[in-house]
Swiss-Prot record:
One of its GO terms (molecular function) is NAD binding. One of its GO terms (biological process) is glycolytic process. The lineage of its organism: Bacteria, Pseudomonadati, Pseudomonadota, Gammaproteobacteria, Enterobacterales. Gene3D superfamilies: Dihydrodipicolinate Reductase, domain 2, NAD(P)-binding Rossmann-like Domain. The active site is at residue 150. Keywords: Cytoplasm, Glycolysis, NAD, Nucleotide-binding, Oxidoreductase. This is Glyceraldehyde-3-phosphate dehydrogenase C.
Length: 333
């Protein structure tokens, strides 16, 4: 059984623990580092506005959480290098703060006694894994790995299936993304991004995304071929990605749907639907990406075709299911 520490017990960190318990994983969470008190961490773990009550017992002491009868140490170190991971035997750290998003920064966890780090965010030019797309590139020499973003985990399976079947020449993607904790609840200053200062629950807010760029780290042959941006919208979770691409051959919508359906066969990470679902239907999905065959469109001008494909994703829970799959494989190497 591999022992794991979680750095950052926010939306993703708490769902990591929840999902590990749900799948009865051999991963054992032995320590959590977060600047919030154990009392508040226990409360937020127990009560989740998106996914409902935590199904296991939760209690706390001044320096631990007691989850399903098991004690998990809680630290409150500002600097990763000072976290006593070694004291609890934490071998792999799931980095969920959003601050240690590079190999150089995450090295601090290794210096503190851990053996490996899995970063739950894009982390620059380093090994980046989307499970069932390029997880076969993981090997025993890897010590710090990124699982990219929720949007990359949605886009990558769809882009790979299209590219494998027809070849992608160039494309642009838009994610219609649920608001997140990095946005403002009401209008107010929020760094240098003017639009980020506007109320998340009241506006459609144009936003940046690194998902298209990160595709090149996951599928090297698509490096530089995709561009993308995001529109943040007033939903709590449940997002959708639209990819418009020029392919290497002429296709019909039926051919595209058949190819994508084939790619989802026996694939725990990439799902398929031909039902007319909406964003709330994807909440709690165990897939990182769900292709929507009802939204495939082909627009032709002369010999040029624009091919629109769409995939849904739960940007919190679906992403975490992907993270856990990668974590379990990472732990075995």
């Amino acid at each position: 059984m591999s022992k794991v520490g979680i750095n950052g017990f926010g939306r993703i960190g708490r769902l990591v623990l929840r999902r590990l318990l749900e799948v009865k994983s051999n991963i054992d969470v032995v320590a959590i580092n977060d600047l919030t008190s154990p009392k508040i961490l226990a409360y937020l773990l127990k009560h989740d506005s998106n996914y409902g009550p935590f199904p296991w017992s939760v209690d706390f002491t001044e320096d631990s959480l007691i989850v399903d009868g098991k004690s998990i140490a809680v630290y409150a170190e500002k600097e990763a290098k000072n976290i006593p991971w070694k004291a609890k035997g934490a071998e792999i750290i799931v980095e969920c703060t959003g601050f240690y998003t590079s190999a150089e920064k995450s090295q601090a966890h290794l210096d503190a006694g851990a053996k490996k780090v899995l970063i739950s965010a894009p982390a620059g030019e380093m090994k980046t894994i989307v499970y069932k797309v390029n997880d076969d590139t993981l090997d025993g020499n890897d010590t710090i790995v990124s699982v990219a973003s929720c949007t990359t985990n949605c886009l990558a399976p769809m882009a790979k299936a299209l590219h494998d079947s027809f070849g992608i020449e160039v494309g642009t993607m838009t994610t219609i993304h649920a608001y997140t904790g990095t946005q403002s609840l009401v209008d107010g200053p929020r760094g240098k991004d003017l639009r980020a200062s506007r109320a998340a629950a009241e506006n459609i807010i144009p936003h940046t995304t690194g998902a298209a760029k990160a595709i090149g780290l996951v599928i090297p042959e698509l490096s530089g071929k995709l561009k993308g941006h995001a529109q943040r919208v007033p939903v709590k979770t449940g997002s959708v990605t639209e990819l418009v691409s020029i392919l290497g051959k002429k296709v019909t919508a039926e051919e595209v749907n058949n190819a994508l359906k084939q790619a989802t066969t026996n694939n725990e990470s990439f799902g398929y639907t031909d039902e007319e679902i909406v964003s709330s239907d994807i909440i709690g999905s165990h897939f990182g990406s769900v292709f929507d065959a009802t939204q495939t469109e082909i627009t032709a001008v002369g010999d040029l075709q624009l091919v629109k494909t769409v995939a849904w994703y739960d940007n919190e829970y679906g992403f975490v299911t992907q993270l856990i799959r990668t974590l379990e494989k990472f732990a075995k190497l």
